[in-house]
């Protein structure tokens, strides 16, 4: 009887651990910017941010990162140098630096764009989403993000951040996550997005849902 109770307890612990490690889905515009701000507020040691487009309409995120820096958190932000239609927003760039945030622009010619939108907190949790840091992304657009707790996945996102921060190549041939571009450059496999997406489509048995702003090759 005691053995049976212990077994049930262990099963419950296992199920709880799975639930805690499961990604949390954020859906916009319903969820708004609060989940992102809450994640930033939880940081105690380090925040890594990689962002394609950041406009002054999202100064609330600038302020949240500045507050983290003031309480001793090391905050680094990597911004796309030339997003489509213009250059990096200087107001955002300067506002981040004024608040003690380390800011760099992406290395020229390394990629066409660094289109990633991610944030890593204390190397324990990561935000990966479709949304830029703009007003419409959290208030008017259909966007999605996942908050990840899996240690290996979070470590991989941080590892790619460090490589892009330094403008270095990184072998992603054994990647856990999906990365673009799907190319081999200088003998280094830098991504797996194309083959992963095609395998997912080809593996469909009953249904396939695809929601995308644009599709081209």
Predicted regions and their residues:
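Charged, low-complexity intrinsically disordered terminal segments
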Residues: 2-5, 9-10, 16-106, 110-217
């Amino acid at each position: 009887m005691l053995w049976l109770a212990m077994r049930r307890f262990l099963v419950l612990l296992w199920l709880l651990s799975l639930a805690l490690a499961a990604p949390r889905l954020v859906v916009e515009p319903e969820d708004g910017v609060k989940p992102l701000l809450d994640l930033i507020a939880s940081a105690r040691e380090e925040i890594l941010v990689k962002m394609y487009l950041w406009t002054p309409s999202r100064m609330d995120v600038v302020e949240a990162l500045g507050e983290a820096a003031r309480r001793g958190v090391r905050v680094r932000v990597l911004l796309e140098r030339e997003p489509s239609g213009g250059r990096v927003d200087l107001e955002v760039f300067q506002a981040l630096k004024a608040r003690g945030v380390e800011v760099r622009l992406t290395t020229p010619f390394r990629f066409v764009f660094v289109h990633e939108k991610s944030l890593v907190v204390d190397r324990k949790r990561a935000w990966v989403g479709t949304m830029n840091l703009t007003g419409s992304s959290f208030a008017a657009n259909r966007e999605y993000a996942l908050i990840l707790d899996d240690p290996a996945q979070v470590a991989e996102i941080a590892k790619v951040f460090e490589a892009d921060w330094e403008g270095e190549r990184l072998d992603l041939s054994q990647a856990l996550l999906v990365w673009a571009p799907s190319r081999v450059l200088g003998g280094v496999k830098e991504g797996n997005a194309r083959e992963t997406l095609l395998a997912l489509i080809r593996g469909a048995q009953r249904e396939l849902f695809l929601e995308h702003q644009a599709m081209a090759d």
